[in-house]
Regions:
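Acidic/glycine-enriched connector segments
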Residues: 1-197
């Protein structure tokens, strides 16, 4: 009997899926880049709106400048914008920009009237919904989710806790790290396992 050779196994490239937010997301992107991994970023918005929102401007002028692709006058806001732009240039982006026009109007209105709680709620609901969608895409493409979380709210749509719960619900294991105690880590495989994690 004639034997046929088994096909050679090929390793697929290691990818980091991240939303590129300021902080842990960008630290992870830096480490992944050093290891030669591909960086994939499902952004909750188109690139310009993503930079403008996630740089967290406090003034209308800074928000509008960033939205137009310019610079913010606040150094902290500009530093966050630079970080997001830097990693966006190095990542393969999937931009969820279909609601950008609507959300940009809400973003501008919130910055123009920061004391208006109704406008703020509308903006945060729309932005949170987009962040949740980007998080869902990220989780669905991941073999393991690494969550750096203080075990705070799970109710904030699109937030870290929400994304961790979503991953566990669809069967993606989560390596959970507590920022105040990095030596305290657990690998979780179900939402029930969150109850005992503290």
């Amino acid at each position: 009997a004639e034997r046929t050779a088994a096909p050679a196994l090929t390793l697929q490239p290691t990818r980091l899926h991240t939303l590129l937010a300021h902080g842990v997301d960008q630290l992870a992107a830096s480490a992944a880049c050093e290891l030669g991994w591909e960086i994939v970023a499902p952004l909750p918005f188109g690139r310009a709106l993503n930079v403008a929102i996630n740089a967290q401007p406090q003034s209308h002028a800074d928000g509008m400048a960033l939205l137009a692709g310019g610079e913010a006058s606040d150094p902290g806001v500009q530093a966050r914008a630079n970080g997001i732009r830097h990693w966006s240039d190095r990542a393969r982006l999937f931009q969820l920009a279909d609601r950008d026009a609507e959300i940009a109007v809400l973003f501008e209105a919130t910055l123009a009237s920061p004391e208006d709680a109704v406008r703020a709620r509308r903006f945060h609901a729309a932005a949170g919904s987009q962040a949740a969608l980007a998080g869902k895409i990220m989780v669905e493409q991941s073999d393991l989710l690494i969550g750096v979380w203080d075990n705070g709210s799970r109710d904030g749509v699109g937030g870290t806790g929400h994304t961790i719960v979503r991953a566990l619900e669809i069967g993606t294991p989560v390596l959970l790290l507590e920022p105040a105690r990095p030596e305290h880590r657990s690998i979780l495989s179900s939402t029930e396992s969150l109850a005992g994690w503290q």
